Amino acid sequence: MTAALWPATLHHLRRDSPEAERLARFYGELLGDRVEALPGGEWLVAGRGRMLVVGKGAKCAVPYFALEMRDAAQLGAYRRELEQRGTAIEPSPSPLFAPGAFAVADPDGRRVVFGLPASASGTEGKTVARLQHFVCASTQLENMLAFYRDRLGLVESDRVLEDGALAAAFLRSDPEHHSFAAFRAPESRPDHHSYETGSWNDIRDWGDRMASLRIPLWWGPGRHGPGNNLFFMIEDPEGHKVEFSAELELVPRETAFRTWPHEQRTLNLWGSAWMRS
């Protein structure tokens, strides 16, 4: 991986909707977070360790996700490494990062933003669940893996194979098992984003919160093979999947990737699984 990328953590992402305010208020209620209007018609949902930008656009779209670097020196060194490789650098689309942030486009056209927060991340709120990873589905999974691993410098943690063909790839930008992953699918689209809680008891408490809001669990509870984390998922009003996770595996930077078979047990050691392809 590039020397300058490690560590980087998911700071925020943008979720688009034809009804941006309605979706922002759903997430505010879901997470118990404050909701505020931003310039340009965007909305901010901010809480303890998590920030979400909601904008007007196509249903379920995630036009970018944003990784926070350690400091300005790391950000500058990383940009220089990318430029030396001939990577096209674009202006940052994020209203939450300070000047100096920049973006690159992945093979599916989604922007990955790198930068530093313009202000402190949310610290208010009683509910514990920090924004931790984003996952997409893609029709060109091999190209996506090559881009994120070889061009951007994320470290491959696990891959899933079906008859020798790549079915999923999990990559990390810090010791947590994955900050980004991609699945092979018939169409390229967002898959889910995930909030990491502290323990199994937190998963229970978030499940109880879903019950109080009359939001049914869509998948889980269960335990993933890659990452070994406890989880459940719900759907937001547009069908985008939202995961609550605990005990995600920590993987040293130098650890080589593992290979898993494409089967239900890989995605859920406890039972049935959501098979993307």
Give the ranges of each region predicted by the language model.
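Conserved short beta-strand elements that form part of the metal-binding/catalytic scaffold
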Residues: 31-64, 68-69, 110-118, 159-191, ...
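Short hydrophobic alpha-helical module
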Residues: 151-154, 173-177, 196, 203-216
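Core segments of cupin and vicinal oxygen chelate
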Residues: 2-50, 96, 100, 136-178
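Vicinal oxygen chelate
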Residues: 1-3, 9-18, 57-81, 83-130, 135, 169-171, ...
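Conserved active-site tyrosine of GNAT-family acetyltransferases
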Residues: 23-28, 82, 109, 144, ...
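N-terminal beta-strand motif that seeds the catalytic metal site of vicinal oxygen chelate
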Residues: 1-21, 62-67, 118-142, 155-158, ...
